Every structure is written in structure tokens, then in C-alpha cells.
């Protein structure tokens, strides 16, 4: 089943890519209307939008999904339910495709809810308590976005149609469109895990690693970014863009800090995804939707590769994800290590890899844009933190000696897994330049002073040195961090967001409810009122019932007892 799915998906992906090139070069957009039901004067019509953006994004989703399924053939080989796993992944991709090609909020909701439902099934695929909790957190966080999307659909009834694409430019300054835009932004923030809905994304790492490679590169988390790209006109002409810039910038900063304190391999990569999602959202909020789309596509390539390499490492390390137990993997697993390092360097923005073209352009656009000093600081400091945790990850996993048990035998994975990784390695190297020439065919003139041009390079070098220094001085930094335990805990636990959004949301209401129950429902009024009366009467009834059902000797004893009382009464008279 893996091979058939791989061939079908890669064929459709290639077709979509060629069509997107044709549409892009000829500046074409196709609307296809399918009349689902026609009864008297009533008809239900489903509309599909095909332009270069939807087709290109769909081709990337299908390509990554095909390689992930091919990779899963070996990774999930020992799993008895691998066919169920492949079916879930295909349902996930189908939901994403429906969301991509829909210009209608109702059909978008079908794909949106499909993503949420199937992601829950995939997160709880390994059946244990941790997976169940992570799945419930993922589902409930995304429910908020679903409700926001339903409210946006209800508000669009004012227009008589749910095809938002026709109203964006005409109604962009109206209050009703602002309300719809704010609800859609809330939905996108939950799906793309922006503050304050960030806690579900690292928790979703309980899913199998191939799912993480698909979910955190091109499908679930990027659905919110893609939806906001479609609604970019409403964001760029209102205060919603400024609010989104603040929240996404803080998300980027928070995720970068958290990743530098984390030791779980998959969680570090998940936090880096969160940081890059904040980068996409922030540049989108400034009105550069093509640039956000560009970074979304390049990020999909190297992040899927990074997760695949992490899966291969975890597979070899007997399912251990602690980077402190790794080391010297470049000697034992050279091909996997090469892919891992290339994807890490692409994440840092190494020149001429996929991430360089989009990240460098974003930082240069930020430098010439009219934004405040705080946002400027968040952009560049977060970039430095990205390089820092990437170098820290490479240091712990690739250098030195192996820190786990000496009986472990490490080697590169079989060619089935390596072929999937090498396909994405090729795209991570050439994908950035290819997309740059396609999406931005004409050169942009960005005039910057020398110190601003060199600022990006300086921030990356300082970030890399910082990551290396905190890695080699781990014992010293551990002792120092214990002196500032509360600060370390705050920075390393995503600013207490997992506690606030889970335990913190229910602790005080439940505690207050328990107090109310004890004070009123089970308090003194109940004790001296109905409950006490019921308790006394039931006790008396039980005693009488016991006496009534007992043997004959009790009746005789009572008879003798009453006769004695009667005689004593008569004697004293």
C-alpha cells in the first residue's frame, strides 16, 4: 500500500507543479463550480479555486506526503496497523487539499475540521496516557479555531454568499469584513499555534515521527498561515495586522528561547517550527503575502527533512529522544548526519540553501520597513536564537563520543528510508533558488546601509557562538541555572503556557466549584435541614425494620419487658 500511495501522490504532485508553472507564467486563475444538488429553484454549488499559489502549495504537500509514506514503509515496518496509519495520512492530505483549493468558508471548514479530527487520530496512534493527553490538548485547542470559523460563516450570511474571495477587495473597509477577518485570524492563530495557543504544538510530538514530518512541515500548522494569506487584504488595511505582528513576534521569540533550554530532540524541532510559523505570520501581517508563501514552501522542505533525520536517529537510539545521550553520530550514521546538518543549516539561513533565500529577504524587507524598534529587535534576536539552538543541537548529537549504552549498534538506515531523505535533501539544496526565480522573476532593489546588510550575518555568527558556548559549558551553566531556577523554568517552559492553558484554565474554576459545594450544597444548612432529617428518619426506620424482621425471642423479651414495667407500675401505685 505504501508503494501504490507513493506513486499516485508523486504523480499528482508533478502534475500540480507543472500546472502551477503554466498558471504563473500566463497569470491565469481558474474557478470551477460544481453543482452538487439542484432542486426547483434551489441549488448547492461547490466552488474550487485553482491559481499558481494553490497548485504550487498542493504540489509541495503531495510531494512531502509521498516521501513521508515511502519513508514510513521502513519506519513503521514492525507496526501491525500500518495500513490504518497510511489511510489516516491519506485522509489528512485529502483534508489539506480541500482547504487549499476552497474559496468558500463552508468548504474550508470541511477541510479544517478534517485536519483537526485526523490529527487527533494520528496523535493518539501510540496508545498511552501521554498520547491521549496530547491528543485531547490538540483537539481542544483547535476547537476554539473551529468555533471562530463557524462564527465567521454565520457573519458572512450578511453578504448572501460564503465565497469570501469575491468580497475581500470590495468590502475591505467595512465593519462586517473586519469582524470576519478578526474571527478568521483567531482561527488561524489556533491552527498555527501562535500565542496564547502555543502549548499544543510541542505536545503533538507524541505522534509517530513520519506524522510529525508531515504535520509540522506542510499541512496542519501551515493551514492557518495559508488561510491568512488568502485574507491578507483585510490584515494589511486594519489594526489586525499590528496585533498579529505583536503576537507572532512574541511567539517567535518565546519558541527560540524555549528551544535553547530543551533536551528532547523532537521538541526542539517542534519549537523551531513554532518559531518559523511566527516568522511567516509576522511578515504576512506587514502585507508581504508572497514572501510569507515563499518561506512557507522553503520551510516545508527542510523541516520535513529535519524530522525524517530525527526519526532515523530515534529509530537507531532505541526510541530515545534525549540529545544528551547522543554524540558522535556523524561517525556512525554519515548519510543521516549529512542530511541532518544540511537541513539544520537551511534552517539557520546558510547561503544558497533553501532557507537562505526566504529568511534573508524577510530580514532585509524588515530592515527597510517602517516598524518599531521592539519588532525589529524580536526579528533579529529570534534569528540569533534559531542559529543558537541549531548549533547546540548539532554539537550534542554529532560531535564527541556516543553517550548512551556501549552495546548499541548504530548504522545508517536502510535505503528505503534514505531514499526519502535524499529526495528532500536535493529539494532543500535547490528548492530555495528555484522558488525564488519562479515567485520573484524580476529583481527587487533593496538599498540598505552596510551595517544593516551585515547585521544579519553578525546576528547569525553571534547566535552560533552562543549556542556552542552554552553547549560546551553545560555543567557550569547547569549550576548557574540552579541559582536562577524560577527564571530558567519560566524561559524553558514556554513562559508557563502549557500550565496556563491546561491546568491553569481549570484549577481555579474547579476549586471554586468545590468550595461552593462544600459551603452551600453540603454546608450547615443542609446538615441541619433536609439531609439531617433524612439521615435521622432513615436510621429510625432501619432500627424498626431490624426489630420487625428478627426472631421470636425478641418479641418474647419485649413481652416480658413490658409485663415487668406494668407490674412495677401497679406495685408503686
From Swiss-Prot:
It is found in: Mitochondrion inner membrane. Keywords: Electron transport, Membrane, Mitochondrion, Mitochondrion inner membrane, NAD, Respiratory chain, Translocase, Transmembrane, Transmembrane helix, Transport, Ubiquinone. One of its GO terms (cellular component) is respiratory chain complex I. Its main location: mitochondrion. One of its GO terms (molecular function) is NADH dehydrogenase (ubiquinone) activity. One of its GO terms (biological process) is electron transport coupled proton transport. It is a multi-pass membrane protein. The chain crosses the membrane at residues 4-24, 44-64, 85-105, 106-126, 147-167, 170-190, 212-234, 239-259, 268-288, 294-314, 337-357, 377-396, 422-442, 452-472, 487-507, 552-572. It catalyses: a ubiquinone + NADH + 5 H(+)(in) = a ubiquinol + NAD(+) + 4 H(+)(out). Pfam families: NADH5_C, Proton_antipo_M, Proton_antipo_N. It is an enzyme of class 7 (translocase). The keyword Metal-binding does not apply. Its EC number is 7.1.1.2. Core subunit of the mitochondrial membrane respiratory chain NADH dehydrogenase (Complex I) that is believed to belong to the minimal assembly required for catalysis. Complex I functions in the transfer of electrons from NADH to the respiratory chain. The immediate electron acceptor for the enzyme is believed to be ubiquinone. Belongs to the complex I subunit 5 family. This is NADH-ubiquinone oxidoreductase chain 5. It comes from Drosophila yakuba (Fruit fly).
Amino acid at each position: 500500500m505504501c508503494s501504490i500511495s507513493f506513486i499516485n501522490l508523486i504523480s499528482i504532485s508533478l502534475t500540480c507543479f507543472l500546472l502551477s508553472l503554466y498558471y504563473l507564467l500566463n497569470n491565469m486563475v481558474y474557478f470551477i463550480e460544481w453543482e452538487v444538488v439542484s432542486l426547483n429553484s434551489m441549488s448547492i454549488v461547490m466552488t474550487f479555486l485553482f491559481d499558481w499559489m494553490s497548485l504550487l502549495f498542493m504540489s509541495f504537500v503531495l510531494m512531502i506526503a509521498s516521501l513521508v509514506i515511502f519513508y514510513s514503509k521502513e519506519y513503521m515496518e514492525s507496526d501491525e496497523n500500518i495500513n490504518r496509519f497510511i489511510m489516516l495520512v491519506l485522509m489528512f492530505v485529502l483534508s489539506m487539499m480541500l482547504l487549499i483549493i476552497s474559496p468558500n468558508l463552508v468548504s474550508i471548514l470541511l477541510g479544517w475540521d478534517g485536519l483537526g479530527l485526523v490529527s487527533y487520530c494520528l496523535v493518539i496512534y501510540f496508545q498511552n496516557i501521554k498520547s491521549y493527553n496530547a491528543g485531547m490538548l490538540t483537539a481542544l485547542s483547535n476547537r476554539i479555531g473551529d468555533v471562530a470559523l463557524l462564527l465567521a460563516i454565520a457573519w458572512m450570511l450578511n453578504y448572501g454568499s460564503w465565497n469570501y474571495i469575491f468580497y475581500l477587495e470590495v468590502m475591505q473597509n467595512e465593519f462586517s469584513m473586519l469582524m470576519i477577518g478578526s474571527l478568521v485570524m483567531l482561527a488561524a492563530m489556533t491552527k498555527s499555534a501562535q500565542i496564547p495557543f502555543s502549548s499544543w504544538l510541542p505536545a503533538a510530538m507524541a505522534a509517530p515521527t513520519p506524522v510529525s514530518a508531515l504535520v509540522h512541515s506542510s499541512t496542519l500548522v501551515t493551514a492557518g498561515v495559508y488561510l491568512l494569506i488568502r485574507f491578507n487584504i483585510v490584515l494589511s488595511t486594519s489594526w489586525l495586522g499590528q496585533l498579529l505582528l505583536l503576537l507572532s513576534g512574541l511567539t517567535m521569540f518565546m519558541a527560540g528561547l524555549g528551544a535553547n533550554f530543551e533536551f528532547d530532540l523532537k521538541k526542539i524541532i517542534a519549537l523551531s517550527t513554532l518559531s518559523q510559523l511566527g516568522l511567516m505570520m509576522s511578515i504576512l501581517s506587514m502585507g508581504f503575502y508572497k514572501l510569507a508563501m515563499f518561506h512557507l514552501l522553503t520551510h516545508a522542505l527542510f523541516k520535513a527533512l529535519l524530522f525524517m533525520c530525527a526519526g532515523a536517529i530515534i529509530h537507531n537510539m532505541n526510541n530515545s529522544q534525549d540529545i544528551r545521550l547522543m554524540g558522535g553520530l556523524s561517525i556512525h550514521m554519515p548519510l543521516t548526519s549529512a542530511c541532518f546538518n544540511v537541513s539544520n543549516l537551511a534552517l539557520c539561513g546558510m547561503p544558497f540553501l533553501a532557507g537562505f533565500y526566504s529568511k534573508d529577504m524577510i530580514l532585509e524587507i524588515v530592515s527597510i520597513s517602517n516598524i518599531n524598534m521592539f519588532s525589529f529587535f524580536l526579528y533579529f534576536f529570534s534569528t540569533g536564537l534559531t542559529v543558537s539552538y541549531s548549533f547546540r543541537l548539532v554539537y550534542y548529537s554529532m560531535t564527541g563520543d556516543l553517550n548512551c549504552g556501549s552495546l548499541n549498534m548504530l548504522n545508517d538506515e536502510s535505503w528505503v528510508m534514505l531514499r526519502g531523505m535524499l529526495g528532500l535533501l536535493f529539494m532543500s539544496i535547490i528548492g530555495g533558488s528555484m522558488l525564488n526565480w519562479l515567485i520573484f522573476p524580476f529583481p527587487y532593489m533593496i538599498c540598505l546601509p552596510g551595517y544593516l546588510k551585515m547585521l544579519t550575518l553578525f546576528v547569525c555568527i553571534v547566535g552560533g557562538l552562543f549556542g556552542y558556548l552554552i553547549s560546551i559549558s553545560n555543567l557550569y551553566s547547569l549550576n548557574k541555572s540552579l541559582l536562577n531556577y524560577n527564571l530558567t523554568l519560566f524561559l524553558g517552559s514556554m513562559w508557563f503556557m502549557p500550565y496556563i492553558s491546561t491546568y491553569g484554565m481549570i484549577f481555579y474554576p474547579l476549586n471554586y466549584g468545590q468550595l461552593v459545594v462544600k459551603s452551600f450544597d453540603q454546608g450547615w444548612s443542609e446538615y441541619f435541614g433536609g439531609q439531617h432529617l433524612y439521615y435521622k428518619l432513615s436510621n429510625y426506620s432501619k432500627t424498626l425494620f431490624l426489630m420487625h424482621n428478627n426472631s421470636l425471642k425478641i418479641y418474647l423479651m419485649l413481652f416480658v419487658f413490658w409485663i415487668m414495667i406494668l407490674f412495677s407500675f401497679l406495685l408503686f401505685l
